[in-house]
UniProtKB/Swiss-Prot annotation:
GO biological process, one term: monoatomic ion transport
Keyword annotations from UniProtKB, A to Z: Cell outer membrane, Ion transport, Membrane, Porin, Signal, Sugar transport, Transmembrane, Transmembrane beta strand, Transport
HAMAP family in UniProt: LamB (MF_01301)
Classification of source organism: Bacteria, Pseudomonadati, Pseudomonadota, Gammaproteobacteria, Enterobacterales
Protein name as annotated: Maltoporin
Subunit text: Homotrimer formed of three 18-stranded antiparallel beta-barrels, containing three independent channels.
Membrane topology: Multi-pass membrane protein
A GO term from the CC aspect: pore complex
Signal peptide (from-to): 1-25
Annotated site residues (Important in sugar transport) in this chain: Y143
Length: 446
C-alpha cells in the first residue's frame, strides 16, 4: 500500500501533463511532393525551363522530392492576447535512390504575439526567421513578392481604411566584402549582410469584391567598418508594388505592377542582391553588377466555370534593364484547366509558353510545354490536396542564346554574360529540340 501511495503523486503529475498537452496541442502543417518519371529518349525524368526565365510551368515538370514540415503551438493565451511559436524545416533531394542524405534548411523559427499592444488592437508583433506575407503564382512556382528571412516586424495595424505592416529582414551574400590581406590585395571571402525594410498597406476595399495592396521595399548592403564592396556593387535599391485582388467566379484574379531599381532587380521579389559576387560550383565567378531597373506586369488567378470546370491562369511581362546590358525581357502565358469527373477524380491539362530576349545579344529563347494528367484529389477544387496524378509532358524549345560560364572569370571577359548560341564556335543555350516525359507524382499540403 505504501508503494501505491508513493506512486500516486507521479500518476497525478503525468495525467496533468497529458491533459495540458491535449489542451495545447501542437499544430502540424506542411507541404510535400515526390514521384517518379521517365524521359522519352531514355533515363530519368528531365525538367524543362527556358534559359533566362526565372521559373517554369510545374505540372508534370518537377524532378525532385521536396518537403516543408511545420510545427507550431500557441504557447500562451490570456483573453485576446497570445504568443505563437512557429517553425519550418525544408528538405530537397533528387529522388534518384532510396537513401538520399541531405542537409535540412531551417527556414522558419519565430514567435508571433497578437494583441500585445493595447493601443493597436488586432496587430501582431513578431521576431525570428519567417515566411513573411509571400505572394506567388502557384502554377509556375514563382514568388514575385517575398522578403522571407530572419527579421522582425509589426503587422496588421488597423488604420481604418486598411491594414499597415512594417518589417525588416536580412539576406546575406557570400564573397561580398573584404578587408586588406597581405600586399594590399583584397580577398573577397566575407559575407555582406543585406537589409530589407518593408512597408505594406493592404486590404483597402476600393470596389465591390476588390482590394488593393501597396508596398515599398528598400534594400541595402550593411557594410562593416574597414571593409569594402566588390567593384560595381549596386549597394542598394527599391521595389515598389501595387496589387489589386478581385473576387470573381468563386475564385480570384490578381493584377500586379512592380518596379525595382539596382540591388532589388536580380531576384525582383524584395530581397537585395548585388553587393557581392556570384559563384559557380563553389569558385569565384563574377560581379553581379545589377545597376539598372526592372518592370513587371503580372495577371494571374484561379476561377471556377460551372460545376465541372476549374482553371488557373497566368500572364506576365518582365523587363530587367541593366547598365551592363546583361538583362532580359521575359514574357510568359499559361493556363491550367481542370475537368472534374467525380468529386475526387479529375483530368488536368497545363499549357505554358515562355519567351526570353537577351538585352546583350537581342536574340530570343522560347519554349512551350504541354502536360496532360489524370488526378485523384481530396475534394473537387483545383486547390484540393493531397493529390496523386499520372502525367505525360511534351516540351518544344528553340534557344538562340545562353550564358558563358567557360573557363575562369579572371581570363574570360564574357564569364557570366549572355552570348549567342554559337559564340566563339561554342554551344550555348539548349539549341532547337523537343522532348517528352511521363510519370507519377503526389502533392500535398495541410
Amino acid at each position: 500500500m505504501m508503494i501505491t501511495l508513493r506512486k500516486l503523486p507521479l500518476a497525478v503529475a503525468v495525467a496533468a501533463g497529458v491533459m495540458s498537452a491535449q489542451a495545447m496541442a501542437v499544430d502540424f502543417h506542411g507541404y510535400a511532393r515526390s514521384g517518379i518519371g521517365w524521359t522519352g529518349s531514355g533515363g530519368e525524368q528531365q525538367c524543362f525551363q527556358t534559359t533566362g526565365a526565372q521559373s517554369k510551368y510545374r505540372l508534370g515538370n518537377e524532378c525532385e522530392t521536396y518537403a516543408e514540415l511545420k510545427l507550431g503551438q500557441e504557447v500562451w493565451k490570456e483573453g485576446d492576447k497570445s504568443f505563437y511559436f512557429d517553425t519550418n524545416v525544408a528538405y530537397s533531394v533528387a529522388q534518384q535512390n532510396d537513401w538520399e542524405a541531405t542537409d535540412p534548411a531551417f527556414r522558419e523559427a519565430n514567435v508571433q504575439g497578437k494583441n500585445l499592444i493595447e493601443w493597436l488592437p488586432g496587430s501582431t508583433i513578431w521576431a525570428g526567421k519567417r515566411f513573411y506575407q509571400r505572394h506567388d503564382v502557384h502554377m509556375i512556382d514563382f514568388y514575385y513578392w517575398d522578403i522571407s528571412g530572419p527579421g522582425a516586424g509589426l503587422e496588421n495595424i488597423d488604420v481604418g481604411f486598411g491594414k499597415l505592416s512594417l518589417a525588416a529582414t536580412r539576406s546575406s551574400e557570400a564573397g561580398g566584402s573584404s578587408s586588406f590581406a597581405s600586399n594590399n590585395i583584397y580577398d573577397y571571402t566575407n559575407e555582406t549582410a543585406n537589409d530589407v525594410f518593408d512597408v505594406r498597406l493592404a486590404q483597402m476595399e476600393i470596389n465591390p469584391g476588390g482590394t488593393l495592396e501597396l508596398g515599398v521595399d528598400y534594400g541595402r548592403a550593411n557594410l562593416r567598418d574597414n571593409y569594402r564592396l566588390v567593384d560595381g556593387a549596386s549597394k542598394d535599391g527599391w521595389l515598389f508594388t501595387a496589387e489589386h485582388t478581385q473576387s470573381v467566379l468563386k475564385g480570384f484574379n490578381k493584377f500586379v505592377v512592380q518596379y525595382a531599381t539596382d540591388s532589388m532587380t536580380s531576384q525582383g521579389k524584395g530581397l537585395s542582391q548585388g553587393s557581392g559576387v556570384a559563384f559557380d560550383n563553389e569558385k569565384f565567378a563574377y560581379n553581379i553588377n545589377n545597376n539598372g531597373h526592372m518592370l513587371r506586369i503580372l495577371d494571374h488567378g484561379a476561377i471556377s466555370m460551372g460545376d465541372n470546370w476549374d482553371m488557373m491562369y497566368v500572364g506576365m511581362y518582365q523587363d530587367i534593364n541593366w547598365d551592363n546590358d546583361n538583362g532580359t525581357k521575359w514574357w510568359t502565358v499559361g493556363i491550367r484547366p481542370m475537368y472534374k469527373w467525380t468529386p475526387i477524380m479529375s483530368t488536368v491539362m497545363e499549357i505554358g509558353y515562355d519567351n526570353v530576349e537577351s538585352q546583350r545579344t537581342g536574340d530570343k529563347n522560347n519554349q512551350y510545354k504541354i502536360t496532360l494528367a489524370q488526378q485523384w484529389q481530396a475534394g473537387d477544387s483545383i486547390w484540393s490536396r493531397p493529390a496523386i496524378r499520372v502525367f505525360a509532358t511534351y516540351a518544344k524549345w528553340d534557344e538562340k542564346w545562353g550564358y558563358d560560364y567557360n573557363g575562369d572569370s579572371k581570363v574570360n571577359p564574357n564569364y557570366g554574360k549572355a552570348v549567342t548560341a554559337d559564340f566563339n564556335g561554342g554551344s550555348f543555350g539548349r539549341g532547337d529540340s523537343d522532348e517528352w516525359t511521363f510519370g507519377a507524382q503526389m502533392e500535398i499540403w495541410w
